[in-house]
Amino acid sequence: METFIQQLLNGLVLGSMYALVALGYTMVYGVLNLINFAHGDVLMIGAMIGLTILQLLEAYVPGLPGYVQLALAILGAIPITMLVNILIERIAYRRLRNAPRLAPLITAIGISILLQTFAMMIWGRSPLPFPQLLSSEPIMIGGAMISQTQVLLLVLAALAMGSLVLLVERTRMGRAMRAVAENPRVAGLMGIDTNRVIVATFAIGAALAAVAGVMWGANYASITFTMGVLPGLKAFCAAVLGGIGNIYGAMIGGLVLGIIEALGAGYIGDLTGGFLGSHYQDIFAFVVLILVLTLRPSGIMGERVADRA
């Protein structure tokens, strides 16, 4: 039972990060009908910027509490990451809105490689240690352990997702986003600035990815210029699992995928008689993707996004 609780906690932590990144995928798809496969590398940029801010704080303002340093790293990473994503939309995607679907897809792959190359040039090829700023004393829950960093990650993820729901449901910008997602042409005729809405969508997705990136580094204590590839692909699987285009689906899909992956890692050895180890846990996300696309393409939430191509 303790193993189950431990893996469940691990899954919630992992799933929270997947959910934050999946929201970026699903929001962009909702308003543009486009999959931004470079989004995982936006997470990487957020983590790198966060680490740079922590290094500057250590050099020029030593002695700050760990929570304060993490908060400043996240607050500093968000605007820079938002700017990067806005530039991606403005330079790369805006001209391709009416292009065949293959063009934005190839462009996204090119942007991903470009971001990784820039990160490698600035921060180097080698993995970078991410400082552990919070106490290593674990918190015990039902015989299972969770670190203070992981508790903070869960709290921040909940706050970020709750804030997004309030923005989408209760603000003028949120109503504009829903209108553009429903029918961009009609939204434009109603006086909604669709370009502004699309830019805001990319910015919000980047902010969520920045939070996930900094907390990913804090949780795993190491980051590298290729770190965004696998989490980005898994977050895409989570978005598809939940129902891409649906923000609630992205949240649920991220959490479900994280739990499936963690439970799979914990029990795969027993299930296969020791033939497979926990290092095969990455296969679960893609098995889930194949099953969802085969059995329920609309995802858990079951909302079919209109094909506007």
PLM regions: where:
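Single transmembrane alpha-helix segments in multi-pass membrane proteins
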Residues: 4-54, 87, 91-103, 239-247
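Hydrophobic core segments of alpha-helical transmembrane domains in multi-pass membrane transport
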Residues: 47-53, 77-84, 111-119, 156-165, ...
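Alpha-helical transmembrane segments within multi-pass membrane transporters and channels
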Residues: 61-111, 118, 252-257, 261, ...
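Transmembrane alpha-helical segments in multi-pass inner-membrane proteins
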Residues: 18, 70-78, 202-203, 209, ...
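Membrane-embedded helix boundary and interhelical linker motif in transport proteins
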Residues: 31-87, 267-275
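Helix-loop-helix "hairpin" substructures at the membrane interface of multi-pass membrane proteins
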Residues: 14, 145-224, 247-253
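Transmembrane helix-bundle core of multi-pass membrane transporters
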Residues: 95-96, 101-170, 197, 263-282, ...
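Membrane-interfacial amphipathic/re-entrant helices at transmembrane-helix boundaries
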Residues: 1-22, 49, 60-73, 99-103, ...
